[in-house]
């Protein structure tokens, strides 16, 4: 009760929370021969921590798939030429981390360990097997090669050893023993002045989530995970960093713009919001203390919406009732959604207008400032919308980023109108029918029938081989 009163007094003015964190790497660390091997099989710890394990397992109940491209086909155009134009689902329970990265069309249909479109780094937030491999191979060894190389090795879903030092005496005694299991994340926290071993308990809780719930990119020939925080964590800081190193994730196939793809920057947006500024952590809102059948308190590992545990989350600080807070959150979510759609409409036109300019004979020099505006507009839009909980974490920052994106998109279209006029084009550039996901994918030349068929063959033939090999090697219990 005393803790609740203290927290209520401390955070009385707060209204929203929803997610997590990040990092930045320097030299990669070699593997240590002295450390105990990471145990990646989550069920190993079920007898020792039964309540935590069963609640973690309950994330499998969060099974619904929401197709973001079907909901908003504009995204297909904005990501033309990038795997996200094939497939993009909203997030679901941690229990599906490995399943979803295998099944997404973005990872392709590799036949061999050296095949496929994506690097090993795409496993990095999916499994405690990642921590095990980094420990065994070192970071250079882990990151080397294609995504398919990790198939027989990375088989256990995101779980215990991702967040806890499961080999420690503290963990054996029932204490949290939270840790940063990804060395690149630990270095990143140090880079922004937050060394994990010197951080307070509340900061450490959010840092653990921030190993994955952050913006990142794949750096260098080895495609190692790096967080773009060298200049700071605001959208403009990261944009400046990426521009300085001339980095792009891909080139939009319509406009030929060198693009940036934001990932899931929950830590950055949470840090910018009222909850982050008042040290209300990811755990406070998404993993509250609850009671088991015997009345013992434990941390609920069924990570989810704070409103699902209102009495143990929001009500610890807020005096408003659940319905009142839900109404406020819904209004902010709608405001962000409305501006998001307006920005997307401008960007869709900009990509097709840029294509028309190229087709009309525009030069690289003429297009450079236009493409820069498109790049910056879409980056700011993407960083806002890729953080699915931004309406909870930092609604004001979300609207600010989207407003800035709208301005940049308008600048691009104004310059395009002037350039097109010099090429004798004064009429509006028509758009193809992109009213559905399927029509939008057809408009950018995707053969979805072939892509889906190849994926299904991969799931039927390659994935079972991975699992058989993992069982033979003792990496899977069943």
From Swiss-Prot:
Which positions carry the signal peptide feature in this UniProt record?
Answer: 1-26
Give binding positions for heme c 5: 275, 314, 317-318
Q: Which cofactor does it need?
A: Ca(2+); heme c
Question: What does the cofactor field's note say?
Answer: Binds 1 Ca(2+) ion per monomer. Binds 5 heme c groups covalently per monomer.
Against Pfam families, the record matches this protein to: Cytochrom_C552
The residues the record assigns to binding heme c 4 are 282, 285-286, 393
Superkingdom as given in the UniProt entry? Bacteria
Kindly state which keywords UniProt assigns to this record, in alphabetical order. Calcium, Electron transport, Heme, Iron, Metal-binding, Oxidoreductase, Periplasm, Signal, Transport
Q: In which pathway does it act?
A: Nitrogen metabolism; nitrate reduction (assimilation)
One Gene Ontology biological process: nitrate assimilation
Binding-site list for heme? 122, 125-126
What function does the entry list? Catalyzes the reduction of nitrite to ammonia, consuming six electrons in the process.
| The protein, known as | Cytochrome c-552
């Amino acid at each position: 009760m005393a803790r609740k009163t203290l927290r209520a007094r401390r955070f009385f003015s707060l209204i929203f929370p929803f997610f997590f964190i990040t990092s930045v790497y320097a030299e990669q660390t070699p593997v240590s021969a002295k450390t105990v091997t990471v145990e990646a099989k989550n069920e190993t710890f079920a007898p020792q921590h039964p309540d935590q394990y069963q609640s973690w397992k309950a994330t499998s109940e969060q099974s619904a798939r929401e197709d973001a491209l079907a909901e908003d086909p504009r995204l297909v155009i904005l990501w033309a030429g990038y795997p996200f134009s094939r497939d993009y689902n909203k997030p679901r329970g941690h229990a599906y981390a490995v399943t979803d990265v295998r099944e997404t069309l973005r990872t392709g249909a590799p036949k061999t360990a050296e095949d496929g479109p994506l690097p090993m780094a795409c496993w990095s937030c999916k499994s405690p097997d990642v921590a095990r491999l980094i420990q065994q191979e070192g970071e250079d060894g882990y990151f080397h090669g294609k995504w398919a190389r990790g198939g027989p090795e990375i088989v256990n879903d995101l779980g215990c050893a991702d967040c806890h030092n499961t080999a420690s005496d503290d963990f054996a005694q029932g204490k949290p023993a939270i840790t940063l299991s990804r060395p690149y994340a630990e270095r990143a926290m140090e880079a922004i002045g937050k060394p994990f071993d010197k951080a307070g308990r509340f900061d450490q809780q959010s840092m653990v989530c921030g190993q994955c719930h952050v913006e990142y990119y794949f750096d260098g020939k080895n495609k190692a995970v790096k967080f773009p925080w060298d200049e700071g964590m605001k959208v403009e800081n990261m944009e400046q960093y990426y521009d300085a190193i001339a980095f792009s994730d891909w080139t939009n196939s319509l406009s030929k713009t060198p693009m940036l793809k934001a990932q899931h920057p929950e830590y950055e947006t949470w840090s910018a919001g009222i909850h982050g500024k008042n040290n209300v952590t990811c755990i406070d809102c998404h993993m509250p203390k609850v009671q088991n059948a015997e009345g013992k308190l434990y941390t609920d590992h069924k990570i989810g919406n704070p409103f699902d545990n209102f009495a143990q989350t929001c009500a610890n600080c807020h005096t408003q009732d659940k319905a009142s807070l839900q109404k406020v959150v819904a209004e902010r979510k709608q405001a962000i959604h409305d501006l998001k759609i307006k920005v997307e409409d401008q960007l869709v036109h900009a990509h097709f207008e840029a294509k028309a300019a190229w087709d009309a004979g525009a030069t690289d020099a003429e297009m450079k400032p236009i493409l820069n505006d498109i790049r910056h507009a879409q980056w700011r839009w993407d960083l806002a919308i890729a953080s699915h909980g931004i309406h909870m974490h930092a609604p004001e920052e979300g609207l600010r980023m989207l407003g800035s994106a709208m301005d940049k998109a308008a600048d691009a279209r104004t310059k395009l109108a002037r350039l097109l006029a010099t090429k004798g084009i004064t009429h509006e550039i028509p758009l193809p029918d992109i009213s559905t996901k399927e029509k939008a994918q057809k408009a950018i030349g995707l053969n979805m029938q072939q892509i889906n068929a190849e994926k299904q063959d991969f799931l039927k033939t390659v994935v079972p081989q991975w699992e058989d090999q993992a069982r033979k090697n003792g990496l899977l219990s069943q």
